[in-house]
Amino acid sequence: MAIDENKQKALAAALGQIEKQFGKGSIMRLGEDRSMDVETISTGSLSLDIALGAGGLPMGRIVEIYGPESSGKTTLTLQVIAAAQREGKTCAFIDAEHALDPVYARKLGVDIDNLLCSQPDTGEQALEICDALARSGAVDVIVVDSVAALTPKAEIEGEIGDSHMGLAARMMSQAMRKLAGNLKQSNTLLIFINQIRMKIGVMFGNPETTTGGNALKFYASVRLDIRRIGAVKEGDNVVGSETRVKVVKNKIAAPFKQAEFQILYGEGINFYGELVDLGVKEKLIEKAGAWYSYNGEKIGQGKANATTWLKENPATAKEIEKRVRELLLSNQNATPDFAVDDSEGVAETNEDF
């Protein structure tokens, strides 16, 4: 619908004044917004990248990854860091739990010599460091491990047994308000790892909740629920975990999709095993009996041998990955924010843990 000429002039003057006062790009028509196409970083799992709909985790946004103990939360974030570093990005790890294992991180492909690491004394210090790194515009990925370990200064200086109701929730709420805009401006991805707690006295519905209040749930563009669903065995030896990740909230594509993959001890996500499964599913890799073939060439008898062949032939693996991404990501459209619902995820609570 055409706008009146006088209104057009008034609008142009107003836009000019806003840009003069707040800088170029402070207001623009949505169709002209250069950030409409969200840049993403791979999670290290092809099936999870596809479940996310955009091909990975979105830059300039807040992401929450939560789950029970030993479910693979830290492993997943280290795989994201490794993928980002391979693209030449700078990453930081805020180790509030003081439990980061550099030897394990190196095994997962992380360049620990170029990984920024901080072990803050208080929750406020950790969040201020995040904000300073984001405002610098020089850091691309920040991981905070974990929200539950972000202890307010007042609690650290107080006695054990003192009541500090809602302190952590208030601290997180204030930090989210401050961080969201800075992350968007600097196009920095901020990943929070979170733990699960049980609400007492819940008779119906999900008794699980996450720590740190409600602010993180609202500000996060993506929330991932990660669970260990079984063991990977070689004979009688357990060599890894079968893992399921559910996309509980997604502001960049359709939510509630799931991905299942293996996390192998000392190796991380079994990417090439996923590639074989998805290649067969999309008919890019032919399977006849126990034999796997690609473009008429046999690549292995049994999944383990086919996986090993792809590891040894990275150019072919990259070609198959590219074709799988084109097939499975091309038809996925973004959904509006109002279509996103946390109802099937972790229950909301006003309590602070």
From Swiss-Prot:
InterPro entries, sorted: AAA+_ATPase, DNA_recomb/repair_RecA, DNA_recomb/repair_RecA_CS, P-loop_NTPase, RecA-like_C, RecA-like_N, RecA_ATP-bd, RecA_C_sf
Signal peptide bounds: none
Q: What is the superkingdom listed in this entry's lineage?
A: Bacteria
PROSITE patterns to which the protein is assigned, alphabetical: RECA_1, RECA_2, RECA_3
Positions that bind ATP: 67-74
SMART domains named in the record: AAA (SM00382)
Q: Name one Pfam family in it.
A: RecA_C
From the UniProt record, give one GO term of the biological process aspect. Answer: SOS response
Which UniProt keywords are present, listed alphabetically?
ATP-binding, Cytoplasm, DNA damage, DNA recombination, DNA repair, DNA-binding, Nucleotide-binding, SOS response
Which molecular function GO terms apply here?
A: ATP binding; ATP hydrolysis activity; ATP-dependent DNA damage sensor activity; damaged DNA binding; single-stranded DNA binding
Localization per Swiss-Prot or TrEMBL: Cytoplasm
An example of a Gene Ontology cellular component annotation for this protein is: cytoplasm
Under the heading SUPFAM superfamilies, the entry gives:
P-loop containing nucleoside triphosphate hydrolases, RecA protein, C-terminal domain
Q: What does this protein do?
A: Can catalyze the hydrolysis of ATP in the presence of single-stranded DNA, the ATP-dependent uptake of single-stranded DNA by duplex DNA, and the ATP-dependent hybridization of homologous single-stranded DNAs. It interacts with LexA causing its activation and leading to its autocatalytic cleavage.
Q: Which family does it belong to?
A: Belongs to the RecA family.
Protein name in UniProt: Protein RecA
- Organism, by scientific name, is Salmonella typhimurium (strain LT2 / SGSC1412 / ATCC 700720)
Task: List the lineage, top down.
Answer: Bacteria, Pseudomonadati, Pseudomonadota, Gammaproteobacteria, Enterobacterales
Q: Which gene encodes it?
A: recA
